[in-house]
A protein has these predicted regions:
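Flexible coil/turn and secondary-structure edge motifs
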Residues: 1-130
Length: 130
């Protein structure tokens, strides 16, 4: 199994979306890439975490590239700190990885998205922390 962490607005909708994709084995909501180790819904504005979905997938059934293309279908990659009616830094977009080898795949998909849109995207690309 492999995993990737995706932030894209309210995590409940994103989690439901990815839970229905063949090859995705498990999804879990949580918070990522804040200033401290842990947070909760009441503290999130102070800790600067993003609402995030952990996506565990079988790379024999679906590629990271395919997961990212699904991701870009449901987010607005040009919006800063908001998705739809959800506003605030906790609703920012981001792709957070554990495996350094994934960074190259993610960066390639980001470059393709920027070329298609003709703009730099506002999606964070960072290793997972906190």
């Amino acid at each position: 199994m492999a995993e990737i962490y995706l932030a894209g607005g309210c995590f409940w909708g994103l989690e439901e979306y990815f839970s229905r994709i063949p090859g995705v084995e498990k999804t879990t909501v949580g918070y990522a890439n804040g200033q401290v180790e842990t947070t909760n819904y009441q503290l999130i504005k102070e800790t600067d975490h993003a609402e995030t979905v952990q996506v565990i997938y079988d790379p024999d059934k679906i590629t990271l590239r395919a997961i990212l293309l699904y991701y870009f279908r449901v987010i607005d990659p040009l919006s800063v700190n908001k998705q739809g009616n959800d506003r605030g830094r906790q609703y920012r977009t981001g792709v957070y990885y554990l495996d350094e080898a994934d960074r190259q795949v993610i960066a390639q998909v980001f470059a393709e998205q920027e070329e298609q849109l003709g703009h730099k995207i506002a999606v964070e690309l960072e290793p997972l922390r906190h």
